[in-house]
Each structure stands twice: as structure tokens, then as C-alpha cells.
Amino acid sequence: MLLTGLLCGILLGFVMQRGRFCITGTFRDMYVTKNNKMFVALLLAITVQSIGFFLLKEIGVLNVDPAENFAFLAVIIGAFVFGIGIVLAGGCATGTWYRAAEGLVGSWVALFTYMLLSAIMRTGPLGELNQTLRSINIEQRNIYDTFGISPWWLVALLTLVTAFYVYKHLSKPSVKVAALKPKKTGLAHLLFEKRWHPFFSAVLIGLIALAAWPLSVATGREFGLGITGPSANIMQFLVTGDGKFINWGVFLVLGIFIGSFIGAKASNEFRVRVPDATTILRSGLGGILMGIGATLAGGCSIGNGLVETAFFSWQGWVSLPLMIFGTWVAAYFTIIRPQRLKLAKAS
């Protein structure tokens, strides 16, 4: 059953790589270029998963309540720090895995420091700090429980909001983008060459995220997609050799790497690229902040931003805007401010 995690990861890695589904870029572009198309795509993926999740619960296929007590202080700090980290690293947790599979050496560095700090925050010297901050919580888990309503009201609201913005974007006049003459035909062209629409990728990601629930639960792991915990588990296993760290999630993240590599290689996008020393140092620092932030917040942009939001936990919906805010702060100091200073000098 653990191998279903590998299959799920391969599919997710392939779709994210071919669809260029970058959550860091999603958050950053909302501020830097005032483009929210990819954020609408993220909402679409959340919505697809949310509808399916509560349907599976309704018919008895899933009998889980994955939300934890809301560790508000750790979530607020962690999500903000994580948002800063993903800009410096050049990709979120999943994005770092799939960019590493494309041959980006900076992402290799970010991935290593992210995995290392995630492990240190769990069972290493910073474990006590993490536990202390996470222990400051309130017994409020899901938004619908807090307000005493059916989760279907929130599903309906999310669906309406998402449908409105999807329709709004699809109603805009399409802009033809210049493209090279296709070298492939048929299925090969569609899979490895044709540019994927973000909303198409989002639906696929939502379906994969939904499928992850019963597949993961069948192995005793009561959660869906998750990146930070499994990434830490790999590091802990390599250090201790203890097989208890190997679970469905570990196979998932390894599958993401494999699927991304397949997508990059087949589409001629794989190339080992060595950045300058400054970029490597920035990537390493970004990975450190990602590991610290995601562990404190109880999840990354996938665990919190895609999965926890789908079942309407307080953790998910509080961490999402804070991750975005952290991304915007980092984007200001690394992109906006340098551009303004350059323009001021030129004038």
C-alpha cells in the first residue's frame, strides 16, 4: 500500500512540473505583477478537493477528523516565516522538490536545508521550542465547528467564489502567445510540449489531492498530501536508520521528484544549472526558513495552503494569508525595492 504514495507523488510531480504550478510564483505575482490568475487556480484545486473530501466523508469512505487544536501563535509566526523562505529559496516545499528534479542546483541546496531544519525542529535541538510554541493552542479546530454549521455551507461558499473568479478569467479575451512550431504530435505533444492551462492543472492537482486521502488513510496515516513531515522523515531515517520514519508520505515526496524528473526530461527542460554563490547562499537560507516556518505552522503551502484549507481548519485558513503576506514582504525587499532604487539612480 505504501507504493500508492509513490504513484500519487509521481502524478503530482509530473502535473506540477508540466503545468508550471508554482505556489511561490502564485503568491508573489499577486503583489509584483498584480496577476491573481494562479491564485484562482489554487482556489480551484482547493475546491475540487474540498467537495470530494466531504462527499467521501458523507458516504462513509473516509472516517477521519485530521484537524488539530489551533496553535495560533506557532501558526502565525511559522506561516509568515515560511512565506519569506519560499521567496529566498525560489520555490515552496513542493516547488523545491520539482525544481530540484529539473536540475536547479540552488533548489538542491534549498531542499537539503529545508529537510534538515524540518528534522531539527521535530526531533533535534529545536524540538523543544517547536513543542512549546505548538502547545499554546485553543480548542478550536474547524471553522464550521466553531460556528456550529454544516461544512457544506462553507463548501458552497468556496465553490461560488471560485466559480465566479474562474468565469471572470475565462471570459477575458484570450491573448495569443507566440510559440515555436511543435516537434511532437498527438499525446506526446499534449503531455510534453503543449502549454497547460493553469485551471486544467489545478483540477488535476485537486483530484490527486483527493485521491491521496483514502490511499494514505489505508496505510494508517490519517492525512492527505503533505510535504514537510515526510521530508523531515527522510532526513531522520538517513541519520538514524530507523524504519519507523518511512511511511506513505515519504514515498509521496520521492514520487514527486521522480514525476518531475520524468516531465522535465521528456519535455527537454532538464538541465543542471549552477547559480552564483549569492543565489546558493540565499537558497540555503530560504530552505532554513522554510523548514522552521512549515514545522511551526504545522504545514507548508501544500499541507496548509491546499489540504487544511480544503477541510476548513483554522490552521489552514489563517496560515494561507500569512504565507502570502510573508511572500509579499520578501518580494518587496528582493524585487520591488531594488527595482525602485535602480530607477532612482537612473533618473
Which residue ranges define each predicted feature?
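Membrane-interfacial helix-loop segments of redox and metal-homeostasis proteins
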Residues: 1-347
